[in-house]
């Protein structure tokens, strides 16, 4: 196990647990991903694009857990998955000092301190790996995300215009941010 489970208090006083994802979470993770992808325009997939089976997800989780280069954390409240975050270290020798982070939280749990907690845990893991730079991408309309990343010390370093186009034609740029650790 790469990460020790940790209980923490949400801003509303409820207690939840952040822990490494486990193979037993596969079926619930697929349903969680379908839900969370339908709650925000700022994730890469629509719910109908989440087509993998629980078995395929279990194999993916197993691979994450067997690799030191990837850590996926989940946040659990009363036995329910409510958020996830991932860090993936770049594999090439010249780039192994870098790690990419990603985060998603169910809408009903936004503004409760979960994103901050997950990203801090991922940063702690990155430091254990000896990484010196964290990277992330977010979409230009995601003001809530931008505020979180700014608060945690990420800085904008690039932008890809029209990176996604929604079903209604709305276009968002992809913003690249980095943080030295």
Indicate where each model-derived feature is located.
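Conserved catalytic-core motifs of GNAT/GCN5-like acyltransferases
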Residues: 135-138, 150, 155-170
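Conserved GNAT acetyl-CoA-binding A-motif
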Residues: 119, 126-137
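Terminal substrate-recognition subdomain of acyl/acetyltransferases
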Residues: 1-14, 168-181
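A short beta-loop-alpha structural element at the N-terminal edge
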Residues: 16-28
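Conserved acetyl-CoA pyrophosphate-binding loop and the N-cap/start of the following alpha-helix
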Residues: 109, 113-121
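A short, internal acetyl-CoA/4′-phosphopantetheine-binding micro-motif in the GNAT/acyltransferase core
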Residues: 102-111, 139
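Helix-loop element at the rim of GNAT/NAT acetyltransferase active sites that forms part
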Residues: 30-48
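Acetyl-CoA-dependent GNAT
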Residues: 49-98, 102-106, 119, 180-181
């Amino acid at each position: 196990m790469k990460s020790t489970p940790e209980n923490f208090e949400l801003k509303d006083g409820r207690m939840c647990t952040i822990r490494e994802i486990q193979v037993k979470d596969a079926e619930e993770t697929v349903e969680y991903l379908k839900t969370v992808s339908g709650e925000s325009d700022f994730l890469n997939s629509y719910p109908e694009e989440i087509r993998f089976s629980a078995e395929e997800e279990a194999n993916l989780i197993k691979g994450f857990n067997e690799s030191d280069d990837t850590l996926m954390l989940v946040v659990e409240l009363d036995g329910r998955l409510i958020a996830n975050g991932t860090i993936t270290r770049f594999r090439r020798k010249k780039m192994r000092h870098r790690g990419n982070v990603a985060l998603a939280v169910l809408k009903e749990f936004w503004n409760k301190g979960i994103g901050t907690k997950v990203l801090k845990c991922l940063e702690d893991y990155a430091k254990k790996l000896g990484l010196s730079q964290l990277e992330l991408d977010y979409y230009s309309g995601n003001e809530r995300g931008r505020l979180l990343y700014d608060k945690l010390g990420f800085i904008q370093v690039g932008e890809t215009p029209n990176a996604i186009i929604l079903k209604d034609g709305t276009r968002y740029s992809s913003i690249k941010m980095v943080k030295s650790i």
